[in-house]
């Protein structure tokens, strides 16, 4: 190397040679530089630092690049000498080249080939790579090299994931030999690797041949997975991600046990052909039931576009009962597509295909999935422009009434085109706002409980212009009248409960008057601490009059539009809010409490109400989702909704319906979320609907207005399944009205820096369809995945 520095060992004992060297190289006090084709001007005995920056007389006549010294390389050592084109360095040898640093006890550097031969305590550092070896051959210019008896650490960056245990440790491996193909690729032989403590690794991979692609993946050939140094899984070929990149291959197998499914064994294959798409296909074997299939496709074909497809199915041999076997097999497929299209258009498709409710109850992995009796499908193309909205849509809704027998109510509106506008004022100085809503399409209804069914396409068209005129009387009163003229055409109707294809028009005049009295508020606080509170009281009064519906019984119930009735009513209520602010920080709403009630001047709703039956109208559903109309009445239940959110550690909501007619609470809903300390959490939900039959004289035989429901769900725990340390979760769902448990869950686990072990017990109890106990064990491997059936945190709510 042409650049040399004074030996550290000579700076103390060779004062005269040092002074002589200073005089010889005064322009560069501690360096001397020569061209790549000339001999150094100073004796090797008087030098200790070399550089490979050449001086050429004619840059255009340079020889082949591979034969030139590496530009910018420096070498430091306790002792150096040069023999021809080879530099010999001993003692604390330190070679620097760009972002690479090579250290060793002894180094031989060939100026022509730019090859370093290093022996003894070899260490290579490059960015996040650290390699230690007994000896090495390293090419300075290309970064290629060979190392023997290697120990190395590669730091990687992994994003936090709710389903994957992430280790802060680097990838560590030991190998007999390692070939550095380029700065980002290593080919290792007879190696083992882990992210655990290398002194006591809980797990490690061993492979005769392996390739490490930095910021990509690690490939193993004919390897095995070892737990406490004991081989437990043979891997003819395996890959796992080294950082953020994905790698195709077989996933870690599924293993579990279930009282109804028996022994569970399965696996899946993951394929990532591009950086914007991946596909997973897998299957599980159930020793008592049959086998299941699953497939997942994820695509991001262009910016602001997303496609997710999920399929799961079971080929079932049948559930054994005292009367024989019951086949509960089936499938469910879901598709979600969203995309922003040119010219301001947006496309969305959210589709769900379910073979039967029995299948969902019997084979759903979580309690929340199992109790969902609805199947929704929606697809639309929409564009918003200058206050207008144009939509083309197809929607369907299916609600299963029972699983055995399989009965349901199915509604469909497809195709449908809708054009609407927001409130717009055509005159700048007149506060008169116009809007409209118009649609045309076809509808269908099927009810397997009663056997009722309409033709596949029943025409339905509507046009509804609206005029709104707000008045502001200073800060004391806001009055907003709204007028709507709605005309709707139906291609069919009901006559004596049967469908007939006689079309008709429904024309209604709708008027509402929104009165907002002045808001009452009070602000107080402590000037010394900067804490301030604000209490606000917001009263509201809304009068509504609708007429023109007539003969409510002839409407086929396609959706909520057909629950519109004549009404003459007033709604009144008050909302209280408590705000808090500290210093210049943001304002937080601590408490909100809303109370409202309706008074019906026409208790028969234009003759729509049928005494002794459960009546659900648009006006009552806007107040509360709990039905209360069983006969004519003037007052609705009083609806109270309280929300308390005093910070990140506590959140609660309490909803009640107080029926003044019966003098009792008819519906109760409570939700409490509490994080009292650090990682502890508690969630409690309680929902209750009181069965209120009408007087016997008005009831049909065996009439039940609203089935009694009283359920409580609780979830308590510490931490989460991918958090380091001890974690636990316990949950229960209990039906108070039936006195039985529907679901129980208990999860306990511990995660270290490189792996974790978890145990889970699940209990599903859904009558004769499913009574199952599951015992699950999972071994989590940091940065890779998990071995077992507990793949992700389960949620009850």
Q: Where do the model's predicted regions map?
A:
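Outer-membrane beta-barrel proteins and related beta-barrel translocases across Gram-negative bacteria
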Residues: 129, 140-193, 198-209, 213-214, ...
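Interaction modules related to DNA damage response and DNA replication/repair
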Residues: 58-77, 90-106, 119-133, 149-166, ...
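Structural recognition of beta-strand segments within beta-rich domains
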Residues: 74, 80-103, 108-119, 123-130, ...
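Compositionally biased, proline/threonine/alanine/serine-rich low-complexity intrinsically disordered stretches
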Residues: 30-71
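N-terminal secretory signal peptides that target proteins for export/translocation
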Residues: 1-11
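Gly/Ser-centered flexible loop/linker motifs
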Residues: 61, 66-71, 80-88, 258-264, ...
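Bacterial N-terminal signal peptides
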Residues: 14-26
């Amino acid at each position: 190397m042409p650049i040399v520095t004074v030996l550290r060992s000579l700076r103390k004992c060779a004062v005269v040679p040092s002074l002589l060297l200073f005089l010889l190289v005064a322009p560069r006090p501690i360096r001397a530089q020569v061209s790549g084709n000339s001999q150094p001007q100073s004796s090797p005995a008087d030098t200790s630092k070399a550089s490979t920056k050449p001086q050429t007389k004619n840059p255009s006549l340079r020889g082949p690049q591979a034969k030139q010294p590496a530009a910018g390389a420096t070498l430091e050592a306790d002792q150096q000498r040069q023999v021809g084109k080879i530099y010999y360095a001993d003692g604390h040898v330190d070679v620097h080249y760009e972002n690479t640093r090579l250290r060793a006890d002894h180094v031989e550097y060939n100026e022509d080939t730019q090859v370093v031969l290093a022996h003894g305590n070899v260490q290579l550092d490059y960015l996040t790579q650290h390699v230690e070896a007994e000896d090495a051959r390293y090419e300075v210019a290309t970064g290629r090299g060979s190392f023997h008896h290697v120990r190395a650490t590669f730091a990687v960056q992994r994003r936090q994931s709710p389903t994957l245990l992430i280790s802060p440790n680097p990838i560590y491996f030991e190998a007999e030999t390692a070939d550095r193909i380029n700065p980002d690729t290593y080919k290792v032989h007879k190696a083992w690797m882990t992210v655990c403590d290398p002194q006591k690794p809980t797990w490690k991979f061993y492979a005769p041949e392996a390739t490490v692609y930095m910021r990509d993946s690690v490939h193993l050939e004919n390897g095995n997975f070892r737990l406490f140094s004991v081989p437990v899984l043979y891997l003819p070929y395996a890959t796992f991600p080294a950082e953020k990149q994905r790698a195709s291959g077989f996933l870690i197998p599924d293993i579990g046990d279930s009282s109804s499914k028996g022994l569970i064994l399965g696996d899946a294959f993951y394929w990532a052909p591009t950086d914007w798409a991946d596909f997973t296909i897998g299957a599980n074997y159930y020793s008592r039931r049959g086998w299941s299939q699953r497939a997942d496709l994820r695509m991001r074909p262009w910016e602001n576009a997303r496609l997710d497809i999920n399929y799961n199915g079971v080929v079932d041999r049948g559930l054994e009962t005292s009367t024989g076997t019951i086949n509960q097999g089936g499938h469910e497929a879901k598709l979600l597509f969203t995309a922003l299209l040119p010219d301001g258009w947006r496309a969305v498709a959210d589709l769900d295909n379910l073979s039967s409710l029995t299948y969902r109850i019997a084979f759903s992995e979580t309690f929340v999935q199992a109790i969902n009796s609805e199947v929704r499908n929606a697809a639309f193309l929409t564009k918003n422009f200058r206050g207008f909205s144009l939509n083309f849509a197809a929607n369907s809704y299916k609600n299963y009434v029972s699983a055995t027998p399989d009965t349901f109510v199915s509604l469909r509106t497809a195709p449908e085109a809708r054009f609407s506008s927001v409130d717009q004022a055509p005159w700048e100085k007149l506060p008169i706002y116009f809007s409209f809503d118009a649609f045309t399409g076809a509808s269908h209804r099927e009810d397997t409980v009663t056997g009722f069914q309409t033709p596949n396409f029943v025409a339905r068209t509507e046009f509804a212009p609206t005029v709104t005129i707000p008045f502001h009387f200073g800060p004391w009163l806001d009055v907003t009248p709204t007028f709507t003229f709605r005309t709707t055409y139906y291609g069919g109707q009901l006559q004596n409960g049967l469908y007939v294809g006689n079309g008709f028009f429904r024309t209604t005049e709708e008027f509402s008057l929104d009165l907002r009295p002045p808001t009452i508020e009070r602000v107080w606080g402590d000037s010394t601490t900067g804490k301030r509170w604000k209490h606000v009281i917001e009263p509201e009064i809304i009068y509504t009059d609708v007429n023109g519906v007539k003969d409510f019984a002839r409407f086929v119930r396609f959706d909520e539009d057909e629950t519109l009735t004549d009404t003459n009513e007033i709604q009144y209520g008050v909302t209280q809010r408590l705000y808090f602010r500290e210093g210049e920080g943001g304002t937080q709403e601590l408490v909100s409490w809303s109370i409202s009630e309706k008074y019906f001047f026409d208790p028969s709703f234009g003759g729509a109400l049928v005494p002794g039956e459960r009546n659900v109208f648009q006006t009552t559903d806007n107040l509360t989702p709990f039905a209360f109309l069983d006969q004519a009445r003037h007052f609705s239940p009083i609806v109270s909704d309280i929300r308390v959110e005093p910070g990140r550690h506590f959140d609660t909501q309490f909803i009640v319906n107080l029926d003044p007619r019966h003098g009792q609470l008819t519906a109760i809903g409570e939700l409490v979320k509490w994080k009292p300390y650090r990682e502890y959490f508690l969630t409690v939900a309680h929902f209750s609907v009181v069965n209120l039959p009408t007087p016997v004289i008005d009831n049909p035989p065996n009439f039940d207005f609203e089935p009694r429901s009283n359920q409580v769900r609780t979830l308590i725990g510490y931490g989460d399944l991918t958090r380091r340390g001890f974690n636990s979760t316990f949950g229960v769902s209990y039906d108070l009205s039936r006195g039985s448990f529907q679901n129980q869950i208990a999860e306990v686990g511990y995660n270290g820096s490189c792996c974790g072990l978890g145990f889970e017990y699940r209990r599903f109890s859904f009558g004769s369809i499913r009574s199952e106990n599951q015992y699950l064990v999972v071994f989590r491997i940091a940065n890779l995945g998990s071995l077992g059936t507990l793949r992700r945190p389960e949620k009850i709510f």
